[in-house]
A protein has these predicted regions:
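A short, flexible low-complexity segment enriched in Lys/Arg and Gly/Pro that occurs
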Residues: 30-68
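Exposed boundary/loop context
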Residues: 4, 8, 18, 40, ...
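Glycine/serine-rich anion-binding loops at beta->alpha junctions
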Residues: 54-90
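Extended polybasic, low-complexity segments that bind anionic RNA or targeting/receptor surfaces
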Residues: 1-46, 91-206
């Protein structure tokens, strides 16, 4: 099992913690991590784009002028693509962007993402994030003490003070342990996680 240093909110070392290899020490599968990120971003797409093709635009059934003798270029319909108000060639239509992964793959991808961050020393474990008040200044001070930039803050449960304190800090995001996901883990420079959150993650994924 990997040993990591545990810090307090002042950035001082207060002990060590063993991380479960079944979650934080697996063989990293980069393909699954990539697939999980692609899936998450694709599944957020709305997919309701729509434009009308030539056959769907109203009007244009009559030839605008005769074929020859007018001096104009020949035209067959005022709803052809080159006309203002005409149809769109290869117009976008509503579609479902969903990418599927089974549960086993999703779990393996998250474990790989967490392991990769541990190996790269991007995981900072804190004994607690017990903020007395919801103040951005206090959270910024904690993150500075922990040398955590572009941080993902993971708590055991949703913590109102942590959420309110961090929401106005650029490139900082909060998530409860039960909502942790591959994209958030991989898109932040540092994962700041409480001891209780580590226990919650290990309980679910070990």
């Amino acid at each position: 099992m990997a040993n990591v240093t545990v810090y307090n909110m002042e950035g001082n070392e207060v002990g060590t913690m063993e991380l479960n290899d079944a979650v934080f020490g697996v063989e990293v599968n980069e393909h699954l991590v990539h697939l999980a990120v692609v899936r998450q971003l694709a599944n957020k797409r709305q997919g309701t784009q729509k434009a009308k093709t030539r056959s769907e635009v109203s009007g244009g059934g009559r030839k605008p002028w005769r074929q020859k003798g007018t001096g104009h270029a020949r035209q067959g319909s005022i709803r052809a693509a080159q006309w203002t108000g005409g149809g769109i060639i290869f117009a976008p239509t509503p579609r479902d962007y969903e990418v599927k992964m089974n549960k086993k793959e999703r779990r393996a991808a998250l474990k790989s993402a967490l392991t990769s961050n541990v190996q790269d020393n991007k995981v900072v474990v804190v004994d607690s994030l017990a903020l007395a008040d919801a103040k951005t200044k206090e959270m910024q001070k904690v993150l500075t003490n922990l040398k955590a930039e572009k941080a993902l803050i993971v708590t055991a449960q949703e913590d109102k003070n942590v959420i309110l304190s961090a929401r106005n800090i650029e490139n900082v995001q909060t998530v409860a342990a039960n909502g942790i996901n591959v994209y958030d883990v991989m898109s932040h420079g540092t994962v700041v996680v409480t001891k209780d959150a580590v226990a919650s993650i290990e309980e679910v994924y070990a």
